[in-house]
């Protein structure tokens, strides 16, 4: 099961971003960052698999900080690009990577909301959704404004 889980994360983090592991070896110096991301994604897959096997509730507790940090990093990256590289459009790799990061962050936030609602028996899931989705909405607004700024 661990190998299947790791392969699934390999597909999510590597294949969906348009990367191929075999492309790194002929020109490793040019693609060091992509190689590091691929290695880290496989390590993350095994770590998450181990956490699921050991204690699922511990996994739920780390989901929200991971998603929040990803959203925060993406916002800072977009802000820095907007401030210093106004005329440089996002590359296809950056667009795919940011789209996948935001989709994974939203998925992790949804898992946290479901866990929070189940734990506290909240009558109004709308309140919980508003509290947890504010960073996601801010991220998407910043992304669309940034894209509009580049296209004008």
From Swiss-Prot:
It comes from Methanocaldococcus jannaschii (strain ATCC 43067 / DSM 2661 / JAL-1 / JCM 10045 / NBRC 100440). Its main location: membrane. It is found in: Cell membrane. This is Uncharacterized protein MJ1358. Keywords: Cell membrane, Membrane, Transmembrane, Transmembrane helix. One of its GO terms (cellular component) is plasma membrane. It is a multi-pass membrane protein. It comes from the Archaea. The chain crosses the membrane at residues 2-22, 33-53, 58-78, 97-117, 122-142.
């Amino acid at each position: 099961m661990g190998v299947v889980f790791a392969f699934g994360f390999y597909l999510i983090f590597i294949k969906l971003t348009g990367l191929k592991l075999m492309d790194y070896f002929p020109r490793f110096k040019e693609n060091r960052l992509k190689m590091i991301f691929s290695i880290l994604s496989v390590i993350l897959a095994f770590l998450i698999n181990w956490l699921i096997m050991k204690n699922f509730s511990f996994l739920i507790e780390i989901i929200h900080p991971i998603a929040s940090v990803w959203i925060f990093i993406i916002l800072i990256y977009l802000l820095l690009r907007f401030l210093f590289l106004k005329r440089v459009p996002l590359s296809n790799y950056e667009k795919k990577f940011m789209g996948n990061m935001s989709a994974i962050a939203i998925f992790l936030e949804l898992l946290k909301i479901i866990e929070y609602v189940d734990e506290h028996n909240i009558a109004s899931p709308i309140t919980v959704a508003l509290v947890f989705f504010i960073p996601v909405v801010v991220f998407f607004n910043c992304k669309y404004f940034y894209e509009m700024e580049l296209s004008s």
